[in-house]
Amino acid sequence: MKTPARRSKRVNQEESETNVTTRVVLRTRKTNCSKTRAARVRPDYPLTRTTSESEMKLMPPEFFQIDALDLAPRLLGKFMRRDNVVLRITEVEAYRPNDSACHGRFGVTPRTAPVFGPGGHAYVYLCYGLHMMLNIVADKEGVGAAVLIRSCSPVSGMETIQERRGLKTDKPVLLNGPGKVGQALGLSTEWSHHPLYSPGGLELLDGGEDVEKVMVGPRVGIDYALPEHVNALWRFAVADTPWISAPKNTLKPL
């Protein structure tokens, strides 16, 4: 009669140990899954760089005074700085003279006059009564061409960026769109005509980092333009970064 009792006690003990082990394994799996989910929400592009701001150099006027289609990809990887905010340019669009999507097609008006200024000046316009859109004037004075800054990634001044955007996040939604870039830099139309190659105010800087992989695709939101301009591959973006705007599936390797 004693042997079955001892066997029953031993079985109960083994089952108890098994249950404890199972609970430990489940807790470990849950913890590991939580860590994995936490890792997935981190920004894919680092917010700090090896190049310090003191090493960044202003681009000279002649850098800008070329065809907008040539200037656009060269702007990728460059830096926009205003006050304590520094952004890295990750996406742009070229707008050329005689382009049915370019503001220059209207000729010189009070609104479009900055587009006809010398290359290297800012052209900021209000879109839909809400968004300040930053463009960099290209080519020689009187040509009427520019490059739209569509997206950037943050380098410094994150608190100021978040405050201006009214958004407490470090994810790409912070800067993946031209209106968001203008807001993060605190721009208004008064910045039009400002020379980006002069120290102070709004500056375009080179940090000595070349972009090796570039994506190209048609521009966004220009359905009103002629078909040849709607389909032109004049949108450029840094490859392998999440800091670009939608649609992303229209971008292909250059």
Curated annotation (Swiss-Prot):
The keyword Zinc-finger does not apply. Pfam families: Pur_DNA_glyco. GO terms for biological process: base-excision repair. It catalyses: Hydrolysis of alkylated DNA, releasing 3-methyladenine, 3-methylguanine, 7-methylguanine and 7-methyladenine. Residues 1-20 are annotated as: Disordered. CDD domains: AAG. It comes from the Eukaryota. NCBIfam families: 3mg (TIGR00567). Hydrolysis of the deoxyribose N-glycosidic bond to excise 3-methyladenine, and 7-methylguanine from the damaged DNA polymer formed by alkylation lesions. This is DNA-3-methyladenine glycosylase. The lineage of its organism: Eukaryota, Viridiplantae, Streptophyta, Embryophyta, Tracheophyta.
